[in-house]
């Protein structure tokens, strides 16, 4: 980059362990973003007070201190990075990094340096270790010469580490010259009072504000929510969670559409843990019209010194607004509200299903959020493409009044949002298209007069839907209808074996209205024999079927999805174990099995699909070259007849 430096695999050090991410330094400041999404740290140049370099095992550490007294440790720089970054900071940011040395002697006596909220134990001029006083929950005297620090034990700390620091004790002899005592106070008491002035040690005694009987959907239950100075506590009948504000990444305030409730989501990094289950999102549900009045248990001095312009003495208003304002003021987390998207009913979300759960999909300015269960946040920058999948693509047994939205991530993970009403198609497509996200399955009609655009302009369900026609043509494979129904009934494989006949996208955009009307008549009548469907279509819609008859037998077979490989492997076992199970139920069972599988269990099928995809790409390249030669010779059409 021209305006700075970019580094990958830089660790953010902290009491909860080290997380890898991407580090960027530029003329306006610096930023760190966790790998795979989550926590982000942005520091403006004007907020920086000091920068230090330290040689640590196998790497260099960059220490950054801010005006708020916070200290960040970025670990993983190479020796050659030190000089280049130092020169860049001196030239563009007006900062000259200092160099610190790490004590490796193992000596456990030395001096204490308190700078901001960081306590550093020094052995001579070298640093032995440092701890953040913001993590201290209690400090007390033990005898006359010992000071004990107890650290917060919350449900997020230690998510990445097996061990966590619980307490630390300092012995301060009466002869200590750094913390001078007198007749009434020993040197240890002077140190204790100094720490008391920095650490939020009183925060565990009394909550700043409490909200009783709050419904939390994830983790489910009714809780008393206490907001303290440095953490929040969720107290329920069966569970008790303590969460440091430093673990809060962002707050989301999302009203339900046509519903008397509003979601407030607290996103965490690291997440809280209950048994083996991790909860990266706390989903709170408030009554939208409920009004509360709360007075904060803070003195005017504390409000003026620590929370100026962030908190007020008292609040009165809607409960979700009061809760969000107070939590934002205490934690410093940003709040995300609904953006420009509006549903067909002027709501902020569309009804859909994820896996086996019904919920709401919120299209936000920088991502999608599915609530309430499982709460799933997808950022736009993580998306490789989205794909609209219309119901009815494999037969008339499923209503065409709904469609599915497949979101494929850059890490090959997929999210399939099902059963979205067709009336939401127009607004959802326009919103996604406006965010410049790649949309698959548009066929050739991406202009203003064809393809999906034509569908979006039609609100009548009987109108011609070129996008649906294209998928129906793909689904009209010449293999057995029974196999097609198996894969269409379960949408987990966003393609099904019908992809074998999907090489005629341009034909779909040219189909007339007679074909769809004919299929609707067939769907409304009693079920005809399977063999009568193509026969009836040939009689009245022969023009529509001609492209199908002209399909080149030399065309390469489409690549199969991981779910298709899984279905092929397990379908026989499913039929043997359940001989009386209908075909559509077998597909449904296979889909449920696929959803419950872990990433490791899916890996063999994913690898098979990737190999098949490469095969298809190679064969397609050869086929396109041969097809171009046939077109030039002008003999392809006569031979097919």
Swiss-Prot record:
Subcellular location: Nucleus; Chromosome
Keywords: Chromosome, DNA damage, DNA repair, DNA replication, DNA-binding, Nucleus, Transcription, Transcription regulation
Segments of skewed composition (Basic and acidic residues): 512-524
Ranges of the DNA-binding region feature: 556-624
GO CC terms, sorted: FACT complex
Transmembrane segments: none
Species, as recorded: Oryza sativa subsp. japonica
A molecular function (GO) term: nucleosome binding
GO biological process: DNA repair; DNA replication
Stated family: Belongs to the SSRP1 family.
Acidic residues composition-biased segments: 476-487
Protein's name according to its UniProt entry: FACT complex subunit SSRP1-A
SUPFAM superfamilies per the UniProt record, alphabetical: HMG-box (SSF47095), PH domain-like (SSF50729)
Protein's UniProt keywords contain DNA damage: yes
Xref: PROSITE patterns: HMG_BOX_2 (PS50118)
Region (Disordered): 459-561
Keyword ATP-binding: no
Assembly, per entry: Component of the FACT complex, a stable heterodimer of SPT16 and SSRP1.
InterPro entries the UniProt entry points to: HMG_box_dom, HMG_box_dom_sf, PH-like_dom_sf, RTT106/SPT16-like_middle_dom, RTT106/SSRP1_HistChap/FACT, SSRP1-like_PH1, SSRP1/POB3, SSRP1/POB3_N
Record's function text: Component of the FACT complex, a general chromatin factor that acts to reorganize nucleosomes. The FACT complex is involved in multiple processes that require DNA as a template such as mRNA elongation, DNA replication and DNA repair. During transcription elongation the FACT complex acts as a histone chaperone that both destabilizes and restores nucleosomal structure.
